[in-house]
């Protein structure tokens, strides 16, 4: 019997003396009773309000009996695909099946279906025809209205219509789920619960729907992508809990999907209360024989300090899910949780993270947001920081200092990600200094994403000059501290707006940096982001202007290969990309070249027999070491590899790439293999 955990079987329910639960929570993730998991927060919150909850984690979707473990619940079913969209969880951007599921015991893949929320909803409806079904979690939240689905390459209907569910609780859900539970407990029919903020419902007519904005009809959007772009941007402009309007999406047969305004953000006291619930902070013991749940490793000794993000990245869905208004826990709440870590025998003295979507956002962007909401017509940081932005790290710094003082804590890391433009906007460098001194272990990961300003513009990221300022300041601070620490940039290929020209520019940047990433993130069109809308429609929904979109798999492979141009396996792709970009000047023996030209078969045979045309002044294949013109009969025969600016221009503190064999190795002497520590290293 595990009284510490909520029941996961009829036996455990009966051991509690219950003959029925109020709600059955069906989850695509294994049961992990930790506040990093949405199912843990919602079920514990319901428990705190007096409701009896049973959990069915990862039911067998091929067997409808798998969701009858507790029988019919008194009030309803709650369904979530898990902490991730099930399709992102299952497939890479190239649509290849992933090998591991970190949210499943033993990391085993295949324990949940594709489109899990839809499958679970219909599975329940087969047996329980009239029992209320409420969808929640990120999959339902980001698919609550018509949305582009990358995996099927089509515009899909609201998840509410395909799942057999009655309501969607979108966003973080604490406020709406308690209101729904109390309404059902009071005897209201689920069809009459159409008024709760943070929910989406379906109706047959609009007689009881007031102050609503009518979106483009689904059937028309399927025929015209530009109509979808307009609808999406209207949705985007109504994600604020203070200014957001009620939205109505018409469907055929006089059916309407109604999105109520977002729920109001939690107060700090409410946030503290949520994270003070009696979590077991680990996975259910029944998973022990399978090796546990891998996802717990990184989050077990991490602290969630905030929610929301006003960064405004185009490829991120946080605006649709958590909103732009920052919600935080108090210092006292964070310290109290951290003091429990040393009591765990698995704790080694390291707090893995103190953050959230963005670690260094600890307050709303400006004073007006908690009263009037975030601006609908402009961003807080993009393209430049707003004049009303309050960039202040004092409170966050105070929290980190107190965490370092806790007995048994050796090191406090920050791994959520630092928003470097916000950091630079703070006139006080104290946090920056202490970040380098105490919270970085050799390398700091940051996300410039790209270096070409046209691509950064589409991404909603600051121009590259801002990142350059950050790198120089980071180096200066570490030098003053006597530390050798480096930056590891996260970079993205094939984002809308990235032509082959911009992709080559990114490769040149990495060449000057002397760094080749081990992994490359190709743009992934996930539901409900501005970038995904660009990918599907070919226009920027903010301006309705056309955007170049790299969609062809081969072109995407070339852009990805350019980031790892030193990898011999990528040679042909890089060569093809350089031809397309009209940059054959980057093929040769100069230190600025990305790859060397390949020898012709006749030249290889001569060298094999002891004759080297190059050693005798020949120019086999149009390559002359003296003239350094590898282009032969290319489009730019007169362009040589010697015509370059200072190779370290703009990167005086970074190590330039070595020259040679296409992998960055010297042709005259062996070079030390590049490692992650070469990033932003001084000469």
Enumerate the predicted regions with their spans.
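N-terminal pre-triad scaffold of radical SAM enzymes
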Residues: 26-29, 290-317, 342, 350
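Conserved SAM/AdoMet-binding glycine-rich loop
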Residues: 18, 25, 56, 60-61, ...
């Amino acid at each position: 019997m595990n009284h510490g955990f909520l029941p996961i079987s009829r036996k455990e329910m009966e051991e509690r003396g219950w003959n029925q639960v109020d709600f059955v929570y069906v989850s695509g993730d294994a049961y992990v009773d930790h506040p990093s998991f949405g199912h843990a927060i919602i079920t514990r919150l319901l428990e705190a309000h007096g409701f009896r909850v049973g959990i069915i984690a990862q039911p067998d979707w091929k067997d409808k009996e798998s969701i009858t473990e507790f029988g019919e619940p008194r009030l309803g079913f709650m369904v979530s695909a898990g902490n991730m969209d099930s399709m992102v969880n299952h497939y890479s951007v190239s649509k290849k099946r992933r090998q591991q599921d970190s949210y499943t015991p033993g990391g085993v893949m295949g324990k949940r279906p594709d489109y899990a929320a839809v499958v679970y909803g219909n599975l329940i409806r087969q047996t329980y025809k009239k029992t209320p079904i409420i969808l929640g979690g990120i999959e339902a939240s980001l698919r609550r209205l018509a949305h582009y689905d990358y995996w099927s390459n089509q515009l899909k209907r609201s998840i509410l219509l395909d799942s057999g569910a009655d309501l969607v609780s979108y966003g973080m859900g604490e406020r709406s789920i308690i209101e729904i539970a109390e309404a059902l407990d009071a005897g209201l029919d689920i069809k009459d619960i159409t008024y709760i903020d943070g929910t989406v419902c379906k109706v047959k007519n609009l007689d009881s729907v007031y102050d609503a904005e009518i979106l483009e009809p689904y059937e028309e959007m399927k025929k015209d992508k530009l109509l979808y772009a307009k609808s999406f941007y209207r949705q985007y402009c109504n994600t604020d809990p203070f200014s957001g309007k009620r939205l109505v999406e018409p469907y055929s047969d006089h059916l309407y999907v109604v999105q109520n305004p977002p729920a109001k953000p939690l107060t700090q006291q409410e946030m503290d209360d949520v994270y003070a619930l009696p979590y077991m902070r680990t996975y259910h013991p029944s998973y022990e024989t399978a090796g546990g749940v891998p996802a717990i490793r990184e989050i077990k000794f991490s602290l969630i300090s905030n929610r929301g993000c006003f960064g405004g990245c185009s490829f991120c869905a946080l605006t649709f899910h958590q909103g732009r208004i920052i919600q935080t826990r108090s210092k006292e709440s964070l310290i109290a949780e951290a003091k429990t870590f040393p009591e765990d025998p698995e704790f080694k003295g390291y707090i893995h993270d103190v953050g959230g979507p963005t670690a260094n956002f600890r307050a709303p962007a400006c004073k007006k947001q908690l009263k009037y909401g975030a601006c609908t017509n402009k961003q807080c940081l993009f393209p430049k920081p707003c004049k009303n932005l309050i960039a202040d790290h004092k409170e966050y710094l105070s929290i980190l200092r107190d965490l370092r003082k806790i007995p048994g804590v050796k090191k406090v890391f920050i791994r959520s990600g630092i928003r470097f433009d916000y950091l630079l906007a703070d006139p006080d460098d104290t946090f920056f200094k202490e970040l380098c001194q105490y919270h970085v272990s050799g390398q700091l990961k940051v996300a410039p994403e790209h270096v070409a300003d046209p691509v950064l513009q589409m991404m909603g990221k600051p121009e590259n000059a801002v990142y350059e300022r950050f790198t120089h300041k980071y180096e200066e601070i570490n030098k003053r501290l006597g530390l050798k620490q480096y930056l590891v940039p996260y970079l993205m290929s094939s984002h809308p707006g990235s032509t082959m020209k911009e992709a080559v520019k990114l490769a040149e940047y990495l060449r000057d940096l002397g760094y080749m990433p081990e992994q490359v993130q190709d743009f992934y069109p996930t539901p409900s982001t501005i970038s995904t809308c660009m990918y599907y429609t070919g226009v920027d929904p903010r301006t309705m202007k056309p955007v170049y979109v790299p969609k062809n798999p081969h072109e995407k492979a070339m852009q990805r290969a350019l980031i790892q141009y030193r990898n011999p396996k990528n040679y042909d792709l890089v060569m093809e990309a350089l031809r397309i970009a009209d940059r054959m000047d980057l093929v040769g023996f100069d230190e600025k070249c990305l790859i060397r030209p390949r020898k012709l078969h006749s030249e290889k045979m001569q060298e094999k027999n002891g004759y080297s045309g190059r050693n005798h002044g020949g120019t086999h294949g149009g390559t002359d070491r003296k003239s350094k013109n590898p282009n032969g009969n290319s489009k730019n025969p007169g362009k040589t590899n010697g015509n370059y600016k200072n190779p370290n221009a703009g990167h005086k503190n970074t190590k330039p790439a070595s020259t040679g064999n296409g992998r960055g190795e010297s042709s005259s002497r062996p070079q030390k293999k590049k490692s992650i520590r070469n990033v932003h290293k001084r000469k």
